[in-house]
Amino acid sequence: MDTEMETEQIYQVDVGNLLAFNPNHRFPSAPSSRGELVKEILTEGTKLVQEIANKLFNFPSTETNDGPIVQLPPPTTKLPREKHIPRPKPPTKWEEFALKKGIQKRKKEKVVWDEQTNQFKRRHGYDRVNDDNDVPIIEAKESDEPGVDPFAKRLDDKKKRVGKQEKNRLQNLKAAEKAGALPSHVQLAATSLPISGTKAQPKKIGKDELGDVAGLAATSTASGGKFDKKLPGEKPPKKQGKHHKYLPVVSGRGDVNAEKEQTNNVLSKIFSKHSHEILNVGKAINMYNVKKEKKKSGRSDKLKPKKDITKKPANKAK
């Protein structure tokens, strides 16, 4: 019991985080080398791990196929955050207006009574209330202009409302980005916002890069942009992909010649590029001149009279 009390006083164990440390540890003397320091750290770390294991075995466990499982208690040590605390977002225009007028947000029901069909329908989504397809008649108003299609005007007004909402959303994101409260998973391409707050602001996209991106987007359809409707003033993409023509798998008439021609074209391109490496012109000229000299010397030897081997050479008078 005394040893357990001593270890509890020496070590502080947080089983919830599987953390143990000794706040009173002191080196008896300064380590003279790195190896001695590592040895001391491993010795002390082994004691701390053993203390955590002793605490775990004191908790009740349940047996499973993978082995005993222990329910850990809640942690007692507060670990520091890796990221800073999220900054509050600036209020949007609607939130400022609602706060000024005292408008409180209330939860709306998902199902609403539709007077056109006399039944309950969803507020949003498929088969919703006040759907444009379910409106057979639109009552005329005194302010309506003659000759204007009310159904087309209804769709046009809806597009304008959606565009205005999108514009307000982008402005809210810009304001949040200026305040440093934009979420890291949101990226606004219109303002070139970075993906993470820790990254530097990206450079402005140049004209060539925009052209490359537009060309990739134009050729990303199933037909490679061939049958797509062109916008007014749209230029053809600069970098158009080339389709590689493969030879047929099943051998037929003329396939051998086509394959031979294709191989010869590849070899001719390789040889033309590296012809200066394959043929040494100076060395070839020297070899040609040497062979020519040898041929000349061989012809002159044939014209000379042959010596009589049987005759002995005459001794010169001393």
Curated annotation (Swiss-Prot):
Biased composition (Basic and acidic residues): 151-169, 226-237, 298-311
UniProt keyword annotation of Nucleus present: yes
Compartments, record wording: Nucleus
GO CC annotation, single: nucleolus
Keywords from the named record: Nucleus, Ribosome biogenesis
InterPro entries reported in the protein's UniProt record: Ribosom_reg
Region of interest called Disordered, as start-end residue ranges on this chain: 59-92, 139-170, 217-259, 289-318
Keyword flag Nucleus: yes
One GO term (biological process): ribosome biogenesis
Primary localisation category: nucleus
Function as written in the Swiss-Prot or TrEMBL entry: Involved in ribosome biogenesis.
Family to which the UniProt record says this protein belongs: Belongs to the RRS1 family.
Name used for this protein in its record: Ribosome biogenesis regulatory protein homolog
